[in-house]
């Protein structure tokens, strides 16, 4: 019963999942996250551990690193995207490149130049660095020289050394301690053991010593680098004098190389690098001073370099290696912009295939850009030990570490002679841009394959659509109608643009005609069209693409036109609403600021006031109405109907004083220019007001009419408006006797005589305070002088006169003098 399959056995203490973090054999894997145990040990190899433990049956122990949390952590680790991996890879490569550059600049050089770029260009270095390094060590391409931003012909040797090393340029007579050097070569130490076999392979037996003794002596003081060993090429039992075993060692070396070449791959036959003896001097000068004493300027980057630069094969122009490695082929593209030479044969490629044109010269724009390089006459730094032509290298003077500048006239003439003609692109001395980027052909083939896959997919899609259209013409018509509906929707409902509609109709008619032509084809032609040629399918795709672009342009044009029309309609609606609001506002303002109020009394007097205003505005000199004397005692209200207009004549009653109103200038008329409507309104208010007597009403109405008559601007001075003023005495004289008329006439005559010297002055009545008019003093002369000493006026008349004329004054100006008389 206890051995049934359903009963789980308790694991031992050493293999328990709970206690196995540090004591079991798998405790280390569990402590690291519980993931290594799953991958390293199968489930069957752990008899004491339950299967439910691996399925994560204990979620409460997930914080210990056991259970589903471990799977979640591993899942989070696996979510890294390809872009992040590429970014991390590029960052690692960049860091490694920086370290390699620092190491190479400290330990490696070729004739005083470097094998890594100097930072003139900060872009991506997409050239093959191994190929460039090999070409520089072989002296077929100029090394990356240190460029100088400035140069002076007067610089001394230590100044040139400081500029080449990137230090501050000292004074001409000042030599820093780090730039001091000794020309005496060091002696060979007695305790230094130099292998004879290395000397046999690095020196050549010559009959005469070279003239550059310093370089020869310095070469013997520096042994071969310990990293480069030639012991496998020689027999380990070689002994004796160097002269006896010289040629035997070479024969054994050649035999070993020949034997190894039969069993080695081409990758293993790459040349081996050799570190030449370190010699900081060339012909008794520091190598920096020797290189930079006659620098040349690169015409592209404008930096000064030693006179050992690359030359273009076509136009023989200087170009540094920094600029040369930046020039490359164009990316694969279609041959629309290809500039083919008419004399060259047509390439064997189908139409429409991607091409990659070779780089052109930056100076003469000739294709197949390449450079050639002539190395300096000395060898320093790294070099190669060729495996296939070792005997030729050993016998050539270029393999020696000595300088060849002063001894060999033939080599001197070769190095200094300028090339007269251009070199061919196939010349072995020419380095093409394709050589430092050998993967250009692979990139071109990849781009062509990708374009072919896209073209095949598009061809299959179009063929399937064509077959579907041939088999189901009803669906084709439905698709055509849907496209027409879509086009109709883009044009907009109710659009009045006839040009767009005509263009759409023409486009639809053309498409319908093409569809009809396809339907009318014979079965044989239809069968042949199912598998069209590649060129014809490509042309059809181009035509369809152009048609789609045209329809898209038409749709965008119609959409923009519809948007413009809607915008114009919206602006018109806004303008109409604005005008309507302005009209309502003006009407409301006019109703609010009307001429008369809406009370019943003003409405009743509207007609009379308007007639008075019109009459006052049109008549130049309105006559004064002659009022009949009232029989009452002045308590009756003078109605407007009691006014009677006499005929327009100048006849007056005899004995009445005739007073005329003149204006000397326009300023007086502008001052006394109230509106006629306002004067009429005041006149009516004066008529309907309750006054003490009819004479008081008469004076108020006369004053109102006088002000109203004076509101006519700029009237002719030749026509004198005659205003007949009837004084209170004249009214009383009409009622009583005629004798007093003569007295009044005498007073009027006296007044005329008094006013005769001042005819130019205007005479106007002083406005009453009840009218609310302000008049400047001295600008108006009022001549209302009643006769004094009238014995015929009774007591009642005197009372009325005292009552009515108590507040009136008369001002008479004669030549600038003002006489003020107060009556009463």
Swiss-Prot record:
Residues 210-222, 493-503, 595-614, 779-792, 807-824 have a biased composition (Polar residues). The keyword Cytoplasm applies. Keywords: Cytoplasm. Its main location: cytoplasm. The keyword Cytoplasm applies. May negatively regulate the SNF1 kinase. Belongs to the SIP5 family. This is Protein SIP5. It comes from Ajellomyces capsulatus (strain NAm1 / WU24). The lineage of its organism: Eukaryota, Fungi, Dikarya, Ascomycota, Pezizomycotina.
